[in-house]
Each structure stands twice: as structure tokens, then as C-alpha cells.
UniProtKB/Swiss-Prot annotation:
The gene is argC. The keyword Lipoprotein does not apply. Catalyzes the NADPH-dependent reduction of N-acetyl-5-glutamyl phosphate to yield N-acetyl-L-glutamate 5-semialdehyde. The lineage of its organism: Bacteria, Pseudomonadati, Aquificota, Aquificia, Aquificales. This is N-acetyl-gamma-glutamyl-phosphate reductase. It comes from Aquifex aeolicus (strain VF5). It holds the Pfam family Semialdhyde_dh. GO terms for biological process: L-arginine biosynthetic process.
Length: 340
């Protein structure tokens, strides 16, 4: 029996909202009913997003609040806004995939330090399931609130998960990740203005990045003990794409066999024999991983590539929603990369 599930997208005109719609419009079971946008309320989709003109949503108007009934909400909103909306949606019996960071970390204290607001909803923090399907698949299936991971944590955690799963000794984790400019969102910012960003790249949030406690929180939950992460992010002058290079020391093992065994049955994670490129994943939900052991230094070097808007955000959100409703995990996610 064909199942049709009605969907509302909050924050539908940001980059993650637009990427989400690209998947939802080809999804066999999800039907978009409400598109929420404070910036474009009252305007039709074809006026704001003309590339969706030939789709069934072209005449839908952007709203302040949903008017049609629905079962599933995707939140592509600022953290503080999601923080307020999630309890209301749960009380209405909706299932929620939240793409913000409002409910990702189990410790409320981390939010004051890294997000700048006081988190007073510990009950919902504990209720939320971290939406990394390759790690928390069974929990996601039984959840009504999934906290969709950040882009950097997705690329990094998939790069180290086999070590965590097998409980091999890890001393510390060093991460250097590079991201396209779309990771900064659609709102204009001077440092991402074309004349200043083109032929330029730079590190940021070197002292403190909000994705660091997110990574450490998941590592602690999966691995069973604390592991510190030294994380440095870099913005590069591309629209989208992410490469995460992870360095760690551990006991000697056949790292390629370990990764191939752990990810053997995963649809969207591919273990490869050469360093991956962002072009391989552009516009997709895939993650390509190259694990390597450097005999000279004794470091494991694991390189992962994702699309920061795909597996790093919106397409992973669809993967999570599929699991929440018992659908095929790859429904709406069969996009092939755009190349070159």
C-alpha cells in the first residue's frame, strides 16, 4: 500500500531548505504541504525560486504558519528559533527533523558556552536522537525528534566511527576540515562577498567552534569515554562540498579492512582506495572515505568527503525521515553527482 505523508518545511528559502525541497519533490512518499518563510511570506514559490516552476509546489505561497495539516516537520531554522518551536510541534503530535543545533548535544551547559543561550529543556535534549543513521539507526526509527547532525561532525564522525565501534585505543583526535561557502548560510556577510572570498581561504573559530562539543558528545556516547577533539575549520572559495582530514593514533590494525567491514552494508558510505574529491559527492547524500596508516609518523589519516548541504544537512535529514516512518532509506535520495 502506497503511503503519502504530508510535510511542512520551516525556513524553506535558505540553502538547506532549498536543498531539502530538491529531494522532497522527487520523493515517492512525502508531499510538501506547507512552506514557511518569514522573508518571503505571501509570495509564490515560482516567484522566489523560479527553478521550481515546473513542479507541483510552484503555486504554493510561503506562509508564516502552516495552514494545511501534516505529519512531518523539517526545521531549517536558527538554533534559538528551533529551540522554541520544537516543544510546540511535539505537543501537536508531529514528527520533527531539526537541522539546527538546538537539540544535538546532551549537556545543557554546552549551549551557554558554545551557542550563547541558556538551554532549559533537558527533557527534550534527552528525548532527541542524534541523526547519524550509520551510528544510531535503530534509535532514529523509534524517534519523534531527530537532531540532524552538523556538516563538520557528519564528515568527521563517519571518518572515525569504525575506531569507536571496535573500541580500539584512541588518545586524541585532530581534525582539519574544509568547507564551501554555502555552509555559512544564505544571508549576505562581508567576508563571503565575492571580491573578498574568491582566490581566498581562511580558518575561523580556531579557539572555539560549536561543532567541537557535538563531536565529543557523540564520541563519548559511542566509545564510552572522553576523547578530546582538536578541530580547525577552513572556508574555501567553492559553493559547496567538504573535506575532513582526521589524524589519530591508535593500536596497529588493518585500517582498510576495518572500514570496509564496518561500512559494507551502508548505502551512502563508500570506502575508497584514494583520497576522495568533493566533485564525487556534489548534490548527493554520499560520503566517500579514504583510510590510511602512515608508517613514518604512526598516525592514522582518514579523509572523508561529503556535500555540506547533502549528507552534511538536507539529504541526511531526508534519510532520517525515511527511517522515522519505516520507508526505504534511499527514498528521494538517488541523486547522482553533478560532474564536472
Amino acid at each position: 500500500m502506497e503511503q503519502t505523508l504530508r510535510v511542512s518545511v520551516f525556513g524553506a528559502t535558505g540553502y538547506t531548505g532549498i536543498e531539502l525541497l530538491r529531494s522532497l519533490l522527487t520523493h515517492p512518499h512525502f508531499e510538501v504541504k506547507n512552506l514557511i518563510s518569514q522573508s518571503y511570506k505571501g509570495k509564490k514559490v515560482r516567484e522566489v525560486l523560479p527553478f521550481f516552476s515546473n513542479t507541483y509546489i510552484s503555486e504554493i505561497e510561503f506562509l508564516e504558519e502552516p495552514v494545511e495539516d501534516y505529519e512531518l516537520a523539517f526545521l531549517c531554522l536558527p538554533h534559538e528559533v528551533s529551540y522554541e518551536i520544537v516543544p510546540k510541534l511535539l505537543s501537536q503530535g508531529k514528527k520533527v527533523v531539526d537541522l539546527s543545533g538546538a537539540y544535538r548535544i546532551k549537556s545543557p551547559k554546552a549551549y551557554e558556552e558554545f551557542y550563547g543561550f541558556k538551554h532549559e529543556r533537558e527533557d527534550i535534549l534527552q528525548r532527541a536522537v542524534y541523526g547519524l543513521p550509520e551510528v544510531f539507526r535503530e534509535e532514529i526509527k523509534n524517534s519523534d525528534l531527530v537532531a540532524n547532525p552538523g556538516c563538520y561532525p557528519t564528515a568527521t564522525l563517519l571518518a572515525i566511527y569504525p575506531f569507536l565501534k571496535e573500541r580500539v585505543g584512541i588518545e586524541s583526535v585532530i581534525v582539519h576540515a574544509l568547507s564551501g561557502v554555502s555552509g555559512a548560510g544564505r544571508k549576505p556577510k562581508q567576508q563571503f562577498h565575492f571580491p573578498e572570498m574568491t582566490e581566498n581561504f581562511f580558518n575561523y573559530a580556531v579557539e572555539k567552534h560549536r561543532h567541537t562539543p557535538e563531536m565529543e558528545d557523540v564520541i563519548r556516547r559511542v566509545y564510552g569515554r572522553e576523547v578530546k577533539v582538536r578541530f580547525t575549520p577552513t572556508v574555501v572559495p567553492t559553493s559547496r562540498g567538504m573535506i575532513s582530514t582526521v589524524y589519530l593514533k591508535s593500536e596497529k590494525l588493518n585500517v582498510k579492512e576495518l572500514f570496509k567491514e564496518v561500512y559494507e552494508d551502508e548505502i551512502f558510505v563508500k570506502v575508497v582506495d584514494e583520497p576522495p574529491q568533493t566533485k564525487w559527492v556534489l548534490g548527493t547524500n554520499y560520503c566517500f572515505i579514504y583510510p590510511h596508516y602512515d608508517e613514518r609518523t604512526g598516525y592514522y589519516v582518514i579523509i572523508s568527503a561529503i556535500d555540506n548541504l547533502g549528507k552534511g544537512a538536507s539529504l541526511q535529514a531526508v534519510q532520517n525521515a525515511n527511517l522515522m516512518f519505516g520507508l526505504a532509506e534511499d527514498d528521494g535520495l538517488l541523486q547522482l553527482p553533478v560532474f564536472p
